[in-house]
Amino acid sequence: MVLLLQYTLIFASVLMLVALGGCFAERSGVINIGLEGIMVIGALGGALVMKFLPVSLGAPLMVISTILAAALFGMLFSLLLAVAAINFKADQTITGTAMNMLATAGATVAVKAMNTAASGGNDVSSDISYVHSKDLFLVRLGSFEFSWFMLVAVICLVVSYVLQIGRAHV
């Protein structure tokens, strides 16, 4: 049961940050249905950067590089929605849905192609050397461990809620 709770907290933090971004986008008048696709492309970019970084780089620098690459890939992919909606006056809902499908399919094809090329024709996942970088993502309280992204997500959630409550009374 504890393991289930740990993994729930680890994976929920990313989804909480994406949902919070969606709330801010909605408040500004943008219907960003493409958030899931942006998240997938960001994850793909982070994984690709981690795969091709040298093993001797060191865990802290590898984690920072991976997070920055994931953010950059996500921002570049989200630029598609901005260009389509602003420059081409495309419907945001249709474009966001198309971006989600494109991201999921594109990430699947990219990962399959990389794994097939790395394994010599077999469709087997290749290894990524983590160099103990998992320890940099975790906060330990006794035997219970959770991602520090969860702390960041909860802090962002509380701050945005407090700011929203403050605006409601003005």
Predicted region positions:
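Membrane-interfacial amphipathic/re-entrant helices at transmembrane-helix boundaries
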Residues: 1-19, 31, 45, 54-66
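Hydrophobic alpha-helical transmembrane segments
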Residues: 5-8, 12, 37, 64-72, ...
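Hydrophobic alpha-helical segments embedded in the membrane of multi-pass proteins
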Residues: 12-21, 37-41, 76-79
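Membrane-interface helix caps of multi-pass small-molecule transporters
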Residues: 24, 48, 52, 76-79, ...
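Short, non-helical or kinked segments that cap or interrupt transmembrane helices
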Residues: 24-45, 64, 86-99
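Alpha-helical transmembrane segments within multi-pass membrane transporters and channels
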Residues: 56-104
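Transmembrane helix-bundle core of multi-pass membrane transporters
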Residues: 103-166
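Conserved small/polar residues in nucleotide/adenosyl-binding loops
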Residues: 168-170
